[in-house]
């Protein structure tokens, strides 16, 4: 039995708690949240046993000798201290993304987990989405032919963050999916953006002199020359959650706004006739997907990794660290008007 504590039961943490309570191999022994009234609501909502420790101080967990693992769903600025302490207590850790806001901190935590022989996993939920898993299988089967480029759009009208810009708020999902589908990480990145709403800010984390970017355009270049282009914006009423990879034989589209058919394979290619390029073999195929809540799969993968003493391959601490490195490089590019920033992936 895995004894786990959930730190942070806000908008996302409450779903982590729900999923861990449903797993037969898990015993939730503690819940931490800075708001006492929130803990009271959670206790009633889930009818928590009187033995479950409810506390506003995460340091109280140190005294729980039976604690095996910790799930952290708090603001990213708190992750480094929380994860480090949990690992030093001898606990396996599942952390909400991003792992931290700085690559050096991420790498330090990965090294600590390795030294302590503990599991460090990051909750990149999209990597457990059936459509993402199905899309990876399509690419591995070579059904798109020669890959040409990728594109994604993640736009909506709010919420507008006051601690990080649209890049840090939105980009990590699509970058994670492209990396997963391609089996590669970028060798260079570029980003440009615009600020309208918060042109001056007192925050010091991942902001530029012009403020928090509301619109960001991202370019990722991979080792084989493949490029992916991402449109990010939180002031666009046209809500989009769309990602695609274009190949010589067709295009694979993951559209989260189409719940009945989120993964589609659009077939088509060109036939040359003299000076013309004529489209041929055009068709559309909606791909069958497995069912299941992605977050439930995140939680069960974390528990299985602990029980089997094996690091999760899909969303390990190292995967989370690589994504933070990419976001940091994109921030550098954004602050230097789109300068090409090489990545050291060693």
Predicted regions and their residues:
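Beta-strand-loop-alpha-helix segment that lines the small-molecule cofactor/substrate pocket
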Residues: 64, 69, 75-127
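Glycine-centered short loops/turns at secondary-structure junctions
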Residues: 90, 117, 225, 337-338
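Rossmann-like dinucleotide-binding domain that binds NAD(P)(H)
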Residues: 158-227, 232-238, 244, 318
């Amino acid at each position: 039995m895995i004894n786990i504590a959930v730190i942070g039961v806000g908008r996302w943490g409450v779903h982590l708690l729900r999923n861990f309570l449903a797993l037969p191999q898990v015993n939730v022994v503690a819940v931490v949240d800075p708001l006492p009234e929130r803990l009271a609501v959670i206790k009633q909502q889930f009818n928590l046993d009187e033995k479950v420790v409810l506390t506003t101080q995460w340091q109280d967990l140190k005294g729980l000798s039976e604690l095996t693992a910790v799930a952290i769903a708090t603001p990213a600025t708190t992750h480094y201290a929380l994860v480090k302490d949990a690992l030093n207590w001898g606990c396996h850790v599942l952390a909400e993304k991003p792992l931290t806001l700085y690559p050096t901190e991420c790498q330090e935590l990965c090294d600590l987990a390795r030294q302590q022989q503990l599991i460090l996993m990051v909750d990149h939920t999209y990597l457990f989405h059936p459509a993402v898993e199905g899309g990876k299988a399509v690419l591995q089967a070579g059904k798109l032919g020669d890959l040409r480029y990728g594109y994604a759009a993640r736009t909506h009208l709010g919420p507008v963050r006051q601690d990080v810009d649209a890049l840090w708020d939105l980009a990590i999902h699509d970058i994670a999916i492209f990396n997963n589908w391609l089996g590669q990480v970028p060798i260079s990145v570029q980003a440009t953006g615009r600020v309208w709403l918060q042109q001056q800010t007192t925050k010091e984390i991942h902001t530029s002199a012009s403020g928090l970017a509301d619109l960001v355009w991202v370019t990722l270049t991979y080792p084989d020359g493949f490029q992916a282009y991402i449109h990010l914006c939180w002031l666009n009423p046209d809500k989009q959650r769309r990602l695609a990879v274009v190949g010589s034989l067709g295009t694979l589209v993951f559209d989260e706004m189409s719940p009945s058919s989120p993964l589609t394979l659009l077939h088509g290619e060109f036939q040359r006739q003299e000076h013309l390029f004529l489209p041929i073999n055009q068709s559309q195929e909606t791909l069958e997907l497995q069912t299941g809540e992605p977050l439930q799969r995140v939680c069960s993968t974390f528990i299985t990794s602990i029980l089997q003493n094996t690091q999760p391959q899909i969303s390990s601490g190292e995967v989370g660290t690589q994504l933070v490195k990419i976001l940091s490089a994109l921030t550098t590019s954004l602050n230097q008007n789109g300068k090409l920033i090489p990545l050291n992936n060693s």
